[in-house]
């Protein structure tokens, strides 16, 4: 897994971040993860982006199912978005995003933390995946 803060700011992630910043500015602090999740779905769909919500992430080891996890959002079948409302992000949050990006075979992900006065944005790049549209 590779965690990067310097992943290329491509047009798609730029659009996602723009919507997230608008939501954070408009709604402010103090809402649930579900509220920000729903607002992101509305805002991203208004931008005519394809939004998948609560995407199943099948976990497997040696071909055996270990259960399911759920990624908050997958945008345009390319970018995994995880939403948090935390005072501070931890390595566990980054590992969670990385697991989802890799198991879903996507090239990149965004971790958006609405629990701070300024929206906290972290980027993840899956170096093992070559994005057909160019991350």
Language-model regions, residue ranges each:
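Solvent-exposed, charged helical/coil patches
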Residues: 1-50, 119, 125-135
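Conserved catalytic cores of phosphodiester-cleaving nucleases, focusing on short active-site segments
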Residues: 28, 51, 73-87, 100
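A short acidic/basic microdomain associated with nuclease active sites
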Residues: 47-63
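Well-ordered beta-strand scaffold positions
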Residues: 49, 64, 78-79, 117
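Short, well-ordered secondary-structure micro-motifs
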Residues: 63-64, 122
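Basic/aromatic recognition patch in beta-strand/loop cores that engages polyanionic ligands
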Residues: 66-71
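Nucleic-acid nuclease catalytic cores
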Residues: 84-131, 135
């Amino acid at each position: 897994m590779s965690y990067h803060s310097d992943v290329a700011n491509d047009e798609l992630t730029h659009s996602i971040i723009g919507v997230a910043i608008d939501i954070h500015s408009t709604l402010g602090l103090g809402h649930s993860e579900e509220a920000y999740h729903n607002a992101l779905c509305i805002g991203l769909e208004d931008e005519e982006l394809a939004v998948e919500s609560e995407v199943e992430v099948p976990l497997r080891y040696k071909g055996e199912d270990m259960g399911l996890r759920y990624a908050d959002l997958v945008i345009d079948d390319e970018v995994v978005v995880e939403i948090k409302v935390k005072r501070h992000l931890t390595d566990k949050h980054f590992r969670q995003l990385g697991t989802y990006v890799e198991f879903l075979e996507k090239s990149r992900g965004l971790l958006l933390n609405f629990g701070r006065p300024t929206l906290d944005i972290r980027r993840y790049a899956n170096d093992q995946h070559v994005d057909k549209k160019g991350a």
